[in-house]
From Swiss-Prot:
PANTHER family per UniProt: POTE ANKYRIN DOMAIN, POTE ANKYRIN DOMAIN FAMILY MEMBER 3C-RELATED
UniProt function note: Virulence effector that plays a role in hijacking the host vesicular trafficking by recruiting the small guanosine triphosphatase (GTPase) Rab1 to the cytosolic face of the Legionella-containing vacuole (LCVs). Acts as a phosphocholine transferase by mediating the addition of phosphocholine to Ser residues of host RAB1 (RAB1A, RAB1B or RAB1C) and RAB35, leading to displacement of GDP dissociation inhibitors (GDI). Phosphocholination of target proteins also impairs accessibility to GTPase effector LepB. Can act on both GDP-bound and GTP-bound Rab proteins.
Fido domain boundaries: 155-289
ANK repeats: 391-420, 424-453, 464-494, 498-527, 554-583, 588-617, 658-687, 691-720, 725-767, 771-800
Organism domain of life: Bacteria
GO molecular function: phosphocholine transferase activity
Reaction(s) catalysed by this chain's protein: [Rab1 protein]-L-serine + CDP-choline = [Rab1 protein]-O-phosphocholine-L-serine + CMP + H(+)
GO annotation, cellular component aspect: extracellular region; host cell cytoplasm
UniProt-recorded name of the protein: Phosphocholine transferase AnkX
Length: 949
């Protein structure tokens, strides 16, 4: 056995934590009953529990070193985060162990995870304002929240107390658990602030004398780490589940088991001390119950022997095993327990009835606790700032959540009001239905049904528009449903705020026995339920619904789903019931035949054709049934196309409303096989859509080379044709391509291959599109350097019409007498992109040298030097123009190189590689570059690049 050293005495408690329950340290208590203990959490990110446990234990063992005084460091924090992400696929792309640089990280915070004092302290954190954080009301978006207001902007410290109250009340108006306030974490100097917070902790913890002072310092800094949010993901696991517990164990305290750990953003330090103490108390309870061999039922969840066995089998943490075998004989366990009890003693004074509802089980103790309590105390709802499980709830709510039968009996005896709604709008009946405890439901129903307002109470809706019946359907048992329906006052078809009825919720939550019970009770079948059945591709359930309710055969949505599921037997039933075989089934007026093709079932397609389905109908976009072949899976397309064209060959060249025939669809999905089949069937390639695009305009961007070659063989003139934006197919494809670093090389090779077709066919490379861009302009903007060089060698130019006109209209006097103005005016005629501008300058230089551009206006190319007079003003101005072009080229080159990233070794390597492998190739192929003195050292962002020409 390994002997324990003094750095982390609280490891004694971690060792005592029952192995089969250790997952509770990482899974929020609010999820235990709903998600079957650890299973829901683990299913979202497989491997996360083992990773988090190994991180906690391995770091704890590292901290626990002989003769070494522990001091927190940024390096330790990074190691915790890296270990939390080990073997967790979901986190690998988030760079475990690496800090954010400028990546935005945001999340919503509901009122249930905030307090007035917490918001006040949050707004007072100076580093949030300095670092560019944002906080305020808004709406969630795909790339982060859209703020209606940012409270950090122009924040006046004197206004913070009143502002904090107003913010909390605004959050509550939207709902206790609903989110309408968002936080965008610090964007600048994350590493600097992380180091400052760490040093602040190391300094302050040394000055603390009492355990409460130390606890406050710990939670204050954990809170700062949390709001800094230095990592892209798993910040909670890193700081709350790992670092916090290490710091607690360093003080000789047990690790924390939270009901709701996500309160470290907008709770105050004092409030967080209570939250953490409550979580420590949970750990003590779990350990004590395990020692007494009594079932652990904290927050109403008890894991079965089967679940415990499955978890132990899954458990894989070598460091945890080491801790389980450590020798604690040098420690004084009694002293540790007394220290913990003293720390937690302050909890006894707070929320006695509410805490009793969760933690007391002895009927005698419960009776004594409630003996002298009045009605207001029994029905008290705790206000903001308390541990989250208490806020807004009465003792009755908590007794139901915890499955505390003895407490519920005593509360009922004391006439507790079971119709009171918490801040989420839930009554005790809602929680009984959600927990699925038939005994508790029976007790509450008995009380409620004896009241005059029973109908009203039974149908009370929470903030989500759900009654207790909705929760019973979603989380309960058939027995619960039966108990509620037999009251004969439950509205079984009432929808919640999202439009879901009880039967829909049961189906979505895989409560199939409850679904059957409700179906047999005559529950209505909504379109939303049918959509859920379609999403699950559940033919069996649709068949079950039809068998129970034949009226559904007249429901158009049900027919659409039967078609989409590809079920011939179900479709037959609808047609026999008199449904029109060509009835439009979607808002786009897709027919049953179209949707059957979409489903990819040749048997169903053949059946509908046999029954007389019309092949000539189109949807609102003019798509025929042959167009719909390409909405099906690739493996089904050939069979479907053969069935349809055998019935109606004219569909092969029938265009849709945009002018695109089915061949276009084959090109869009890059299906070489089907494109070849359609071409062999006689598909034409000379069509144009409404924007003048031919088939190659689509093919060149989307398709592999073989399809394009097949089309070009059919008609090579398509390469020349320009659309309404004046682009030929190559030009258009280049314009539409969105370049990404990961695929840039592959994209450029594709265009290099395509350019061979242009050069072979003699396509004009210098036509300008509607925006005045040539092919070379666009290739430069995409930084396809090898393609640019190839095009330049073939005679491609940038668009120099504007600077060329300027030079042709410039006279010698304007050039020679006002050289600075001339240079600036010429610079304005160039493109803003330095790469394109360099190429424009090169084209101007070459054309001037070759006398294709005459500048100044009076310059004659063969003008010589007079022996007596020397060079004329026009000749001098001509030379000045060439000199200015060289200066501008040099400045644009400097600008281009100066913009290259150079912060960090990897960025410097990438910039150097970019220059050596790509940019240098372009520059060396520009004639003017040979006339410019190029530097061997160039300043880039944050570094100097070595340039070897």
């Amino acid at each position: 056995m390994v002997k324990i050293m003094p750095n982390l005495p609280g490891l004694y408690f971690l060792q005592a934590y029952p192995s089969e329950e250790i997952w509770r340290l990482f899974v929020d208590g609010r999820f235990w009953s709903k998600e079957n203990g650890w299973r829901g959490y683990e299913s979202r990110e497989p491997g996360c529990l083992n990773a988090a446990l190994e991180s906690l234990c391995s770091i704890a063992l590292q901290v626990e070193k002989s003769g070494e005084e522990f001091e927190l460091s940024v390096d330790l924090i990074k190691r915790i985060h890296k270990k939390c992400g080990k073997k967790v696929e979901e986190l690998q792309e988030k760079n475990p162990g690496e800090l954010r640089t400028d990546e935005p990280v945001s999340f919503g915070i509901p009122a249930g995870r905030a307090s007035i004092k917490g918001i006040e302290e949050f707004l007072s954190l100076v580093f949030l304002t300095e670092g560019g954080a944002e906080f305020g009301p808004g709406k969630a978006g795909p790339f982060g929240p859209r703020f209606d207001k940012n409270y950090f902007k122009n924040l006046n410290p004197e206004q913070i107390p009143d502002l904090a109250k107003q913010i909390y009340f605004d959050m509550c108006k939207y709902g206790h658990s609903n989110t309408n306030h968002f936080y965008l974490a610090v964007m600048k100097n994350v590493d600097v602030y992380l180091e400052k917070i760490t040093q602040s902790y190391n300094k302050e913890i040394k000055t603390a004398e009492t355990l409460d002072e130390k606890l406050k310092i710990i939670v204050k800094h954990i809170r700062m780490y949390e709001v800094l949010h230095p990592f892209r993901d798993a910040n909670g696991r890193t700081f709350v589940n790992n670092l916090l517990n290490i710091l607690l164990m360093q003080q000789g305290l047990p690790p924390a088991t939270f009901y709701e750990p996500n309160v470290f953003d907008l709770y105050s330090a004092e409030e967080l001390v209570v939250v953490v103490k409550e979580a420590i108390f949970n750990t003590v309870e779990i350990i004590e119950q395990s020692k007494r061999k009594t079932p652990i039922t904290l927050y109403g969840y008890h894991s079965s022997l089967e679940e415990q066995t499955k978890f132990r089998d899954m458990l894989d943490s070598p460091s945890y095993e080491k801790i389980k075998h450590m020798d604690f004989s040098d420690l004084n366990p009694e002293k540790l327990h007394l220290k913990t009890q003293k720390c937690l003693s302050s909890l006894n004074e707070q929320y006695p009835l509410h805490r009793g509802a969760i933690y007391l089980s002895d009927p005698g103790e419960i009776k004594l606790l409630l003996s002298n309590r009045n009605e207001s105390q029994i029905n008290q709802q705790i206000e903001q700032g308390a541990p989250p499980i208490y806020v807004g709830k009465t003792p009755a709510h908590l007794a139901v959540i915890s499955g505390n039968m003895a407490m519920l009996d005593e509360l009922i005896a004391k006439k507790a009001d079971l119709s009171l709604q918490d801040y989420d709008g839930k009554t005790a009946l809602h929680y009984a239905a959600e927990c699925g405890n038939m005994q508790i439901m029976g007790k509450i129903l008995k009380v409620v049904l004896s009241q005059e307002d029973a109908i009203k109470v039974l149908n009370i809706k929470d903030n989500h528009g759900k009654t207790a019946f909705h929760y019973a359907a979603e989380f309960g048992t058939p027995e619960l449903i039966s108990a509620l329906t037999t009251t004969e006052v439950i509205q079984i078809n009432e929808p919640d705020n999202s439009g879901s009825s009880a039967i829909t919720l049961a189906y979505k939550n895989h409560k199939l026995k409850i679904f059957d019970e409700l179906l047999n009770s005559g529950a209505d079948i909504s379109d939303e339920l049918l959509d859920a059945i379609w999403a699950r591709k559940d033919k069996e359930t649709l068949g079950k619904i039809i068998a129970k309710n034949e009226k559904i055969l007249l429901n158009k949505e049900a027919f659409r789903i039967a078609i989409s599921l590809g079920s011939v037997s179900l479709v037959k039933k609808f047609l026999r019931a008199g449904v029109d075989i060509d009835i439009p089934l979607t808002k786009d007026k897709a027919t049953p035949l179209m949707l059957s093709i979409n489903s990819g079932n040749p048997k169903l397609v053949s059946y509908l054709l046999k029954k007389g389905a019309n092949t000539r109908l189109t949807d609102t976009s003019g798509n025929s049934v042959l167009h719909y072949v390409f909405y099906s899976k690739a493996e089904n397309r050939e069979a479907l196309a053969n069935i349809i064209t055998e019935k109606d060959k004219k569909l092969i060249n029938q265009p849709n409303a945009n002018g695109n025939p089915p061949l276009y669809n084959a090109v869009v999905v890059n299906d070489l096989k089907m494109a070849t089949i359609l071409l062999e069937m006689g598909a034409r390639v000379d069509f144009e859509d409404r924007l003048g695009n031919n088939i190659l305009h689509s093919a060149m961007r989307r398709c592999d080379l073989p399809i394009i070659l097949d089309i070009v063989k059919k008609d090579s003139t398509l390469l020349h044709k320009r659309n309404s934006e004046r682009r030929n197919p190559f030009h258009q494809a280049l314009h539409e391509m969105h370049t990404f670093p990961s695929s840039k090389e592959t994209e450029e090779i594709h265009f290099m291959n395509l350019s061979d077709l242009l050069l072979k066919e003699g396509v004009d490379l210098n036509k300008k599109d509607i925006k005045g861009k040539t092919i070379l302009d666009i290739a430069l903007s995409k930084q396809y350097f090898h393609l640019c060089v190839k095009l330049m060698k073939a005679g491609a130019h940038t668009n120099i019409s504007s600077p060329s006109k300027f030079l042709k209209n410039s006279d010698a006097n304007s050039i020679l007498e006002r050289p600075f103005k001339f240079k600036n005016d010429l610079k304005k005629e160039l493109d803003n992109n330095p790469l394109i501008a360099m190429a424009q300058i090169n084209d101007l230089y070459v054309q001037i040298k070759n006398n294709r551009i005459r500048t100044p206006t009076g310059y004659a190319p063969k003008e010589g030097v007079s022996f007596f007079k020397g060079k004329s003003n026009d000749a001098k101005a001509h030379d000045e123009v060439l000199s200015v072009l060289k200066e501008l080229y040099d400045s644009k080159l400097t600008e281009m190189l100066g913009n290259l990233p150079g912060e960090g070794l990897e960025e410097i390597k990438r910039s150097q590689k970019f220059f050596d492998g790509e940019l240098k190739l372009l520059i060396k192929n520009q004639d003017i570059s040979r006339k410019v003195d190029k530097k061997s050292i160039q300043e880039a962002v944050g570094t100097s690049l070595k340039l070897k020409w």
